């Protein structure tokens, strides 16, 4: 007789086996003791954490050293900041010790492990996610699955998770969780207003969780990371979950397909290179003040069009294309995309071209300049708002200008502030600057016969120009894609 819930045999177990295709290790936790094998306050596994940290940093830390670091992480996770303090450490390290090697796409330094039904406990309260994804022993993500054709399952699970994440007793677990996946292994029904069926992902939140669909656009490059299922590993997963009897059944074989909805989103989000990219560039915190003067923090994860736009920009830059249009971004997604690319392109130009990137967000209305300024500052950028043409002339003719805040600067400017005089000059210093122009609403105000576009093009002939629009114009003499070509 088969044991467990229907979603175990139809969704969870096939998903666990699929993770092994991606190079993850399945670990049984039947013999793992809380506060012996892992820290019960954070669910960080000592052995995986210690081994990975030593490999990454070429150190010989002891178990006690590792526990001290975890203790410091615990203090950060106690903050009422949705894990922002912890995230900074995840990105940059702590006391000179890196917790993740973001360049290790082969998995020789980082540790990639999945477990099932790991208790998230605080006193008498607990919950056990179906699949927990451990990166270097840290539970950075988890997956909840429901049986197929259960139209209320996803909404019910979201409500349940919102109650848990809003409960202060789970604050540390909310902070360490970077994003979650919820799936009932059905295809999306695009007629549904609410996320009723399909596989969705969301960043952690104290309040409402926003579920996003994921539609893969780069399947071929992900196939290269796919491995064959090892029979012994598959049987270990099945026997560890008391479901060895389902092996070979039509339902199990079908659910094991790499093309199932659950397995597709796992491939898209958890392939090693993709996951490292998301953890490095795909997550941001937005801090705002509400009408009552209370500071609110939101955690955002890239929507899939923003992810693929960023990868397209990278690919085109490597091909030597220095200007292009991103045509499918809409609303506030454009500022979010620009923010993510500030982080990404800062590293890209530093590592691949040895240049210091300098960023400009160009709008065609004063109200949009103020709006963009607020959006970028809320995400943590230092913003320089150009007030007049003279200020821009000073800015663009001073390649060595920098700030001492430690933050990357985004210069926000109205297109009308470009003039014949605002042209770059060679540096008097040994500074190789790469200017990057983000052009908001690129279907407006950039007539190829007008002076605005001419002044923009002349300001820096070597600038990278990324035009953002939801409605590219195509017509006689005015074709957005002819001006900037096509990035994505």
Region spans (language model):
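Hydrophobic positions in the central parallel beta-sheet of the AAA+
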Residues: 361, 411-413, 437
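Structural recognition of the conserved hydrophobic beta-strand(s) that form the central parallel beta-sheet
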Residues: 182, 411-414, 464-469
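Conserved helicase motor
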Residues: 366, 386-397, 415-420
